């Protein structure tokens, strides 16, 4: 008679274990010997019946329970021990796409209690119960192989089972053989630290990450303060952030589909607390990451007129010399959008001439249109911004890259006499030449700007200078008397007055 032991489990499950005595076994349900597995000796076979899951939510559903079997001895092979560990881990998760789902009821491991006959351990549904069949536990294919054929790592539907298999140290020897008293013993893992499986990589070497491409800022920011979740593989910590969890490191190094880092997103969504957290934890190199439009977080902070964010980024060491797709630095953007407060923050702490670094600000740097910051401020007719730039060392006579105009030429083109007077008082060269040889007086005379022409003449402009077309300012004006540098001319005793 077979000895039958039955234990009830929660959720209408029943675990039945039968001990079948084999040849050479005198004590009923004794331990399996090594020869019994190979069919050359006696021993008993253990058969485990696992009923169908009732009340489970789909495939892989149902409560997890631990298998209790007689004490494991040396007769058990490592594939069998790994299979028991996978059973202890509970039901497996759904299979990954592209893999054929396993069929329930196939043998987990085989042992021969008698020569020519094999004892089978299988999972079979209980006919008295109905419900979805559970997926085959992980490690079944490995249990069917011999010790020499077992692969070191297998990927199937059972992620939890894979972890339990990896938690078994390969160098650990099999348990010592000894008599079994037949009492149920819990099947537990060998002692030792549990190692997490490493992430799978594709053929191109890119990391397969389930959160890749997520554009949700709320989910990303929640990882910074939420509870630590289990990460599939350990990651190397960034410099100076070794105390962070892998989940927090992943959130801090998040990059969206547009190339925006968490620092970019904190500026865009006006989240100063998150920005300060990033500045405190991340190294300076992360702050200079450019998105798909070649914009740094400093560019965006200036665009959105956030002086506090600009000051914090500058103090952290963010580069002020990086250019976007238009060749504009953050200061170019501040001049274009006339954000005076942001421009002040960018110019704070600027190193002395000749002592700058690669991250220092070059006020003479031109964008792809050939315009320096002073040129842009002049075209915007923003005199306070022009004063700020000149006070911080901007070259007043720097020429733009397309035609060689200076700020004074551009001020004449804006027809703002006040800007012309301001630049002349600041020391602008009154006879600065363009690439075609024209001076500011050529431009004023050719446009018929009599008031600006008079201002230039009073400042010492030469009305006889010729351009490449051999023209003087007097040749370009109809009223040549206006270009004379005198203000006390009299005709018939009457004072000649120059009016705008």
From Swiss-Prot:
Sequence segments annotated as region (Disordered): 1-66, 84-215, 222-241
Tissue specificity of this protein: Highly expressed in spleen, testis and lung, followed by kidney, pancreas, heart, placenta and brain. Also expressed in granulocytes and macrophages.
Subcellular compartments: Cytoplasm
Keyword Mitochondrion: no
Alphabetical UniProt keywords: ANK repeat, Cytoplasm, Phosphoprotein, Repeat
Function per UniProt: Sequesters NF-kappa-B transcription factor complexes in the cytoplasm, thereby inhibiting their activity. Sequestered complexes include NFKB1-RELA (p50-p65) and NFKB1-REL (p50-c-Rel) complexes. Limits B-cell activation in response to pathogens, and also plays an important role in B-cell development.
Full protein name: NF-kappa-B inhibitor epsilon
Organism of origin: Homo sapiens
